[in-house]
From Swiss-Prot:
It comes from the Bacteria. This is 2-C-methyl-D-erythritol 2,4-cyclodiphosphate synthase. 4-CDP-2-C-methyl-D-erythritol 2-phosphate binds at residues 10-12, 36-37, 58-60, 63-67, 102-108, 134-137, 141, 144. The keyword NAD does not apply. Pathway: Isoprenoid biosynthesis; isopentenyl diphosphate biosynthesis via DXP pathway; isopentenyl diphosphate from 1-deoxy-D-xylulose 5-phosphate: step 4/6. Its EC number is 4.6.1.12. Binds 1 divalent metal cation per subunit. The keyword Transcription regulation does not apply.
Length: 159
């Protein structure tokens, strides 16, 4: 069995009137994230991790923000495309660990729904998906509530 590891990172700034979607879950908040797509910083980081694990580039190469076809795109569909590329290379998700870095809103009430959504996109069981959140103790752009960041690390296994 071959094992590959990928890391993804994404950031979006606050300032949109679009709904806030994180990990495929709509979260009530007074503003959304500015982005060409739906702005799901969590699924963008996960997509980059999956693509990176198999040396398939990054989300920007596959879905450029200069391409109007992806304006308002559902990030779950982008991740599903990345997963299909992995399946073509005969790899599946071993496990994934996600860290959301945000001062607000509180993520705890939404973690289980995010785990379920991510597991569905990755075609894996929820036990293979971990999502956690932290703040920056009011430091930096996240602490000033200018945006949200997300890290994702994925282990992919050959089948």
């Amino acid at each position: 069995m071959k094992i590959r590891v990928g890391h993804g990172y994404d950031v979006h700034r606050w300032g949109s009137d679009k709904p806030l979607i994180l990990g495929g879950v709509e979260i009530e908040h007074h503003q959304g994230l500015v982005a060409h797509s739906d702005g799901d910083v969590v699924l963008h980081a996960v997509t980059d991790a999956v693509l990176g694990a198999l040396a398939l580039g990054d989300i920007g190469q596959h879905f450029p923000d200069t391409d109007e076809r992806y304006a308002g795109a559902d990030s779950a569909e982008l991740l599903s495309h990345a997963v299909s590329l992995c399946q073509e290379k005969e790899f599946k998700t071993g496990n994934i660990d996600v860290t959301i870095v945000a001062q607000a809103p509180k993520m705890a009430p939404h973690i289980d729904d995010m785990r379920s959504s991510i597991a569905q996109c990755l075609k894996t069981c929820i036990d293979n998906v971990n999502v956690k959140a932290t703040t920056t103790e009011k430091l930096g752009f996240v602490g000033r509530e200018e945006g949200i960041a997300c890290h994702a690390v994925v282990l992919m296994e050959s089948f």
